[in-house]
C-alpha cells in the first residue's frame, strides 16, 4: 500500500512542511509568552504530567501557591489575583502543550517512515536529527525557566538566547531538507562562500543580540530612532563599558549593539546585491531576502518607538524566521 519511493517523498514533504509550520507557531507562542511575562507561571517541568490544565479551584490554588514562592511574584507581581494568574498561566501552558505535540509529530511520522519505507531508494535516517534537536530544545527550555525560579526575577537572557537560537536552527535545518527534496536548481557561478558565511554570522549575531535585548527588557529604554534619546551612544554608559565584563548584561549597550549590527548587516547586503547584478543571477532570490531584511528593520524601529508594543514585538521576532529562510534559500542555491 505505502511502500514505494514516490509515496515516501510525498509524505516526507508534507511532514516537513507541516512540522516547519508548527515550529513557527511554537516560536510565536513562545515569544508572546515572553512578552507577557508568563514564562515562570508554571514552576515545575512536568514532562509527563501537566498535560491537562487545572480543572478545579484546588488545582488552581496549588499552581498559584507555587508561583507565589518565586522572586517574580514577590518582587514584581505581589498581590496578583488568581484571575490575573490564570492569564499568564495559559500562555505558558499553551507553549508547553504545543511543544509536546511537536515532539510527538516529529517522532511518530519518523517511526512510520522507518517501518514502511526503510528499503526504498530515497530513505534516510538523517531526519532523526530533527527529533534529537527537538528533545534537546525541551531540555534547554526547562534550563532557561529554572534560571528564574530561585534568585532572579526573570530568566537568564543568555539561556533565552540559546533557546531561541536552537529553535531557529531547527527551522533552518527543516527548511534545508525541504529545499533538498524539491531539488532546487543551484547557481552555476558561485558567490564566495566566505562572504556568504560572514553575512550569516552577522544575522546570527543580530538574532542573539535581539534575544539579549528581550531578556533584559532593553527595548523599554531609548525609544527613539535614529538617535538614542538625542545622542548616537547611550548617555548612561561610556565607551569604556564596551570592554568590561558586564558588556552583555547592560541593556543600553545591547540596544546600541543591536542597532549598530543592523546597519552593518545592511551595508554588506548592499554589497551582496552588487555581486548578484555582476553575476547576472535570477534577482528574485536576493530581492526576496532584501524585502525580508527591510521589513525586519521597519518592524524593529516600530517596535522600539512603540515601547515594545506586543503585536509589533511578536512580528519582529517572527521576522527573523523570514530573514533566515530567505537567506538560507540563497545559501542553498550557492551550495555544491
UniProtKB/Swiss-Prot annotation:
Interacts with CtaB. It catalyses: Fe(II)-heme o + 2 A + H2O = Fe(II)-heme a + 2 AH2. Pfam families: COX15-CtaA. GO terms for molecular function: metal ion binding; oxidoreductase activity, acting on NAD(P)H, heme protein as acceptor. The keyword Membrane applies. Catalyzes the conversion of heme O to heme A by two successive hydroxylations of the methyl group at C8. The first hydroxylation forms heme I, the second hydroxylation results in an unstable dihydroxymethyl group, which spontaneously dehydrates, resulting in the formyl group of heme A. It is a multi-pass membrane protein. Heme binds at residues 258, 316. It is an enzyme of class 1 (oxidoreductase). It comes from the Bacteria. This is Heme A synthase. Belongs to the COX15/CtaA family. Type 2 subfamily. It comes from Pelagibacter ubique (strain HTCC1062).
